[in-house]
């Protein structure tokens, strides 16, 4: 079970990768397998603090899976992005094409937690 401790006062530069997905039931096993493979690689990267996956249980949102990855700083995110792109290229993985093939829709982005908004 993942553990993520978010102490914004002690770590004000934390960066959050929040990805929201709508996953057709028929594609769910392939999607989950790819998600686990991706996480196994990301966990090896410097500055990665943790990851949590949420599954919708109620409400009007179109998204049924939400993932949140926590990074120690904007610099860690930038370095990780380069390594992830290189890794995907080395294994011939095309994320947008794979999501399209599975019929998955996604909203992806990086976020911070501005102190003035807390």
Where are these regions (language model features)?
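Short acidic/polar alpha-helix capping motifs at helix-coil junctions
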Residues: 2-5, 17, 30
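Short, well-ordered beta-strand segments in beta-rich or mixed alpha/beta enzyme
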Residues: 15-22, 51-84
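Short amphipathic
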Residues: 18-20, 105-112
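Short, surface-exposed ligand-recognition loops at beta-strand->loop->(often short) alpha-helix junctions
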Residues: 22-34
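An amphipathic, aromatic/His-enriched active-site/gating alpha helix that lines ligand/cofactor pockets
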Residues: 2-3, 9-10, 37-49, 70-108, ...
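Short glycine/proline-enriched loop/turn "hinge" motifs that connect secondary-structure elements
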Residues: 7-11, 58-59
């Amino acid at each position: 079970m993942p553990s993520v401790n978010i102490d914004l006062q002690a770590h004000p530069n934390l960066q959050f990768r929040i990805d929201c997905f709508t996953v057709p039931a028929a594609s769910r096993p392939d999607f989950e397998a790819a998600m686990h493979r991706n996480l196994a690689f990301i966990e090896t990267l410097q500055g990665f603090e943790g990851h949590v996956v949420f599954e919708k249980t109620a409400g009007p949102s179109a998204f049924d899976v939400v993932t949140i990855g926590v990074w120690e700083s904007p610099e860690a995110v930038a370095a990780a992005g380069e390594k992830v792109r290189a890794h995907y290229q080395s294994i011939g993985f095309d994320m947008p094409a794979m999501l399209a093939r599975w019929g998955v829709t996604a909203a992806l982005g990086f976020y911070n937690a501005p102190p003035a908004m807390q």
